Amino acid sequence: MQIEVFTQSAIKITTTKNIYFDPYQIKNKYHDADYVFITHDHYDHYDEESLRNILKETTIIITPECLEDRVKNITKNYITVLPEKSYSVGELSFETISSYNNDKPFHPKEKLYVGYKLKIEDKYFYIMGDTDVTNEALKVKCDICFVPIGGTYTMNVKEAADYINTISPKLAIPIHYGSIVGDINLYKEFIELINPSIKVEAYIK
């Protein structure tokens, strides 16, 4: 298994399949995506240029309902999802987790944005999307958590660390910092706040 974080929240997990999440600023024409998961409709999470650079004829896109009108202009191979549901598509089974701000206006709960929990090679991954620490997120059990730390639009670094220490995954991977909001070195503060029993890997440096 190989994990890559390109920038912001753009993630690629490679096993026997290539699984992307929120592709953004991907300039190379890979055309290798088997699945693409989109968390919400902001430009740094739904980037059509990046999508076109990774899509192939059989790619399946998984997207919140708010993006259906845009996605269907790119491909017919997509499904729409709602928060707090379970789905299966192809070889993958996954759950959607509500992704929203508690007291900020950027990601209202009523927009029905999502994070994703899915099982890959006997490990449970949680890709949170742009969210604060919510009741729904606190219920998630996972092995690997991609957690936003940049603040402003999401939880800040201390909130993110407290959250990770609470749910205690085996591995935490900080995202959503270093390009739009959050200093590139923010991951260092995050690492210092994490329980030593939890491994941290920072791909954005």
Give residue spans per PLM region:
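Binuclear metal-ion centers of metallo-dependent hydrolases, dominated by the metallo-beta-lactamase
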Residues: 1-4, 75-87, 138-141, 161, ...
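Active-site metal-binding motif and surrounding structural segment of the metallo-beta-lactamase
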Residues: 24-70, 141-146
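Charged helix-capping and loop-helix junction motifs
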Residues: 108-112, 155-162, 186-189
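Redox-cofactor binding/interface segments in oxidoreductases and associated redox assembly factors
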Residues: 21, 37-38, 95-99, 147, ...
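Metallo-beta-lactamase
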Residues: 117-170, 174-182
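Core dinuclear metal-dependent hydrolase active-site scaffold
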Residues: 1-31, 80-140, 155, 203-205
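Active-site environment of divalent metal-dependent phosphoester hydrolases
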Residues: 27-28, 42-46, 68-71, 85-88, ...
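Portal/gating segments that form or line small-molecule/metal binding sites
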Residues: 49-102, 114-116, 188
